[in-house]
């Protein structure tokens, strides 16, 4: 490992230990001294706050007007039921919000498995208990709204956004699919150097996203936010007016820059979609007609485009640009 004293080491992914379907440990080394904490803390904050997910935001329960009520024949009060719904882990394909229903009667527990939903919705933990019916003639009927979002949005922040009918209960929305993330920095050694860092990330999710995929998305978000500093100019220099390009440079990049999974990337190439500009002009319906490209791949593509401020179904006049040769 001979080189300039000012040359930075480039870390490599040493190991990914899948402890369970929702729990993984990732080891990265070697890092220059101090970079373990620099990268570990940045990734941890992004993983906790910036990975999109789904959460229960509104609930309507027959016979209930406000959250401070109780219902005969149910052990829990309404606030307890709302707290249990808040912990519901839901995965939705191709939709930003859905309405779920639950109708249960008779003695016994009411679980997430009793929720009625279509094929686009997956309940991660169907055994999750929502409440208990304590009488044979007791029943509960509810409508549950699940929305896509990011971070944590308390119910109080949404109270005045629109007029809501009496009986529609708001729930604090925790959209993040990452339940726990910690990092540890240990000493690493490369040849004669013993002053290096090893970064160990340990992540747990609610099951709606693979831990490895969550880390990859967080790293992508961090890299994109730092791009502005790479292109930083000295503001004291007089700015030379440049001709505004006809298209956003991002649209001229190959789809490989999106770092999609191999399956999604191959499906796009098979349809001669080589550039991001080609991709954003396609609609969801058109992409779903692509052989081997399912709803999971479509959701991945939409998420990656959204992180760049793009979406499917965009109209680009005069595409491709003059002199732009499609591979």
UniProtKB/Swiss-Prot annotation:
GO CC terms, sorted: cytoplasm; DNA-directed RNA polymerase complex
SUPFAM superfamilies attached to this UniProt entry: C-terminal domain of RNA polymerase alpha subunit, Insert subdomain of RNA polymerase alpha subunit, RBP11-like subunits of RNA polymerase
Stretches for region Alpha N-terminal domain (alpha-NTD): 1-233
Domain remarks: The N-terminal domain is essential for RNAP assembly and basal transcription, whereas the C-terminal domain is involved in interaction with transcriptional regulators and with upstream promoter elements.
Signal peptide coordinates: none
A Pfam match: RNA_pol_A_CTD
CDD domains: RNAP_alpha_NTD (cd06928)
Entry protein name: DNA-directed RNA polymerase subunit alpha
Reaction(s) this enzyme catalyzes, per UniProt: RNA(n) + a ribonucleoside 5'-triphosphate = RNA(n+1) + diphosphate
Superkingdom per UniProt: Bacteria
